[in-house]
């Protein structure tokens, strides 16, 4: 019996978009690791166990949601557009035996957008596995998810509370026998938190959104959009019912905050 050979590799990326009326800002964390596999004279063992790749992708989604449930996270919903993006990229990695989030010259955000997915957040996990003895469907699915679970950056994507949808692709290289898996996660643009602030007071007001400071002149309205649940703090402004101190809120989609002056001095904040 020939000795068993097992190899694996994992990469993760998170892409988030931060929106204000103008300008639009984007923040991307993108590892530039790149590997190209050269099997030399090695030929994949065609007699080795062969998993069902479509069922492996389904298993990865199921195991991911089970892992999220154990950590009090909501389940991710399968999205066809994310699934196509993930499968197309897995096929590319397998066809070229390359390993990088930008192996095809594109960012994950570009790949999902090309499939028509309008996102507020996108995250991606990729990995490859090899075992000379092959894998069953169950073994391969568990190998991928176990590897991601034990990697801090991949684990962060698996458990991100602000992600809502998932697509998974799995492919096998005919040249090297490596199995490649891609997880694309998303929060759709439709779930962005959009809220407004109107200054009806007689002077400029100051506030922060997620720690970033803003000043709003009288009679102006500003619209903020965030992909993650924001924190809003008005400095030196009292919320209705507050006896003292600054007014703090957790805005929801569609909220409208109006700041008004008070006869006795100071300001009040009304949320609708």
Segments from the language model and where they lie:
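Structured interaction patches on ligand/partner-binding surfaces of diverse proteins
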Residues: 239-267
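Bacterial N-terminal signal peptides
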Residues: 12-23
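A short, solvent-exposed beta-strand micro-motif common in secreted/extracellular proteins
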Residues: 228-242
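A well-ordered secondary-structure block
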Residues: 108-184
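Surface-exposed patches in mature extracellular/periplasmic domains of secreted proteins
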Residues: 48, 70-84, 96-108, 153-161, ...
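Asparagine-centered strand-capping/turn motif at beta-strand->loop junctions
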Residues: 193-203
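A short alpha-helix/helix-coil micro-patch that ends at or immediately precedes a cysteine
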Residues: 30-96
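Short, surface-exposed glycine/acidic/tryptophan-bearing loops
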Residues: 28-33, 38, 81-136, 159
């Amino acid at each position: 019996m020939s000795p068993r050979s097992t190899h694996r590799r994992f990469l993760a990326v998170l892409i988030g978009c931060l929106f204000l009326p103008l300008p639009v800002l984007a923040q991307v964390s993108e590892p530039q690791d790149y590997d190209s596999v050269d099997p030399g004279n090695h030929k994949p063992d065609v007699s080795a166990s062969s998993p069902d790749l479509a069922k492996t992708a389904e298993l990865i989604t199921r195991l991911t949601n089970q892992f999220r449930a154990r950590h009090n996270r909501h389940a991710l919903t399968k999205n066809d557009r994310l699934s196509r993006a993930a499968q197309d990229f897995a096929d590319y990695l397998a066809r070229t035996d390359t390993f990088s989030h930008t192996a095809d010259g594109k960012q994950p955000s570009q790949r999902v957008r090309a499939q028509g997915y309008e996102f507020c957040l996108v995250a991606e996990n990729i990995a490859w596995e090899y075992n000379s003895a092959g894998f069953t469907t169950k073994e391969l699915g568990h190998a991928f998810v176990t590897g991601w679970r034990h990697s801090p950056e991949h684990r962060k994507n698996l458990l991100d509370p602000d992600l809502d949808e998932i697509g998974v692709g799995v492919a096998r290289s005919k040249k090297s026998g490596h199995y490649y898996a891609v997880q694309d996660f998303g929060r759709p643009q439709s779930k962005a938190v959009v809220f407004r602030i109107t200054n009806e007071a007689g002077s400029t007001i100051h506030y922060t959104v997620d720690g970033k400071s803003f000043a709003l002149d009288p009679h102006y309205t500003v619209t903020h959009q965030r992909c993650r649940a924001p924190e809003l703090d008005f400095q030196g402004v009292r919320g209705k019912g507050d006896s003292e101190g600054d007014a703090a809120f957790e805005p929801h989609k569609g909220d409208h905050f109006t700041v008004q002056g008070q006869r006795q001095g100071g300001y009040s904040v009304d949320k609708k």
